[in-house]
Amino acid sequence: ACVHYPVYEQNEVDEKILSLEEVIEITHSKNKPVSVDAAGQIYPLENFGKYVKMGADFQCIAAKYMGAPHSTGIALGTKDVIDTIARHSFVGYESRRIRGIGRPHKIDRQEIIGVYAAVKRWMSLNHEERLSYEESKTLNIVNDIKDIEGLEVKIIDNIIGHQPFGLNIDIDSKKIKSNNLDFVDVLKNSEPSIWTRVPDGKDTIEIHVFGMTLDQSKIVGKVIKEKLEGLMI
């Protein structure tokens, strides 16, 4: 058994939730390990191994956010934990006396090479240029729709983690014949289809540009503008 702790450094701190330091202290006092879900904490680079240095026994990072295959990730932790994880291996499964655990969930050699290449590239990447590129995609959308009457547009200025920049939009139903939830469906049924959402606990439509090209961001801005202008009261 262990205590699993998710980390979202880009979010505001919830004072009602125990801090990672407190969780580590309490859990270790009971001689149990702490694992940290740091899936999207790929930037700043100091986050690699940060939570283990804080005292956690293990942290996992999703490699897909760095360009590796979708099903892959990397593990950072104490020697005991990493040695245990290594037993989840399919190498020599048919012939070893101690067979690997989790064979149905294996990843193949090509994916492992993909993770290595993605992490190596990520560590040497010019992140200022990367963030500037993400901001440019955001501005492509914002500039198309910012002057539409009845629409409030706010840029997401976060640069931490795997989804830098993006925008939130809020529809005034008194001026536009739609609302945020309905407009999500309008975009989903548009051509091309654009998938957005109103996240749980929030009221506005959230649009992230992670994974888009510059040209695709221009298309998104154009479609949103056309759909909104067609719904003006």
Describe each model-derived feature in a short phrase.
Residues 102, 106, 110, 114, ...:
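C-terminal alpha-helical cap/extension of soluble enzyme domains
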Residues 57-59, 127, 180-181, 195:
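Short secondary-structure boundary micro-motifs
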Residues 91-94, 187-194, 225-232:
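A common structural junction motif
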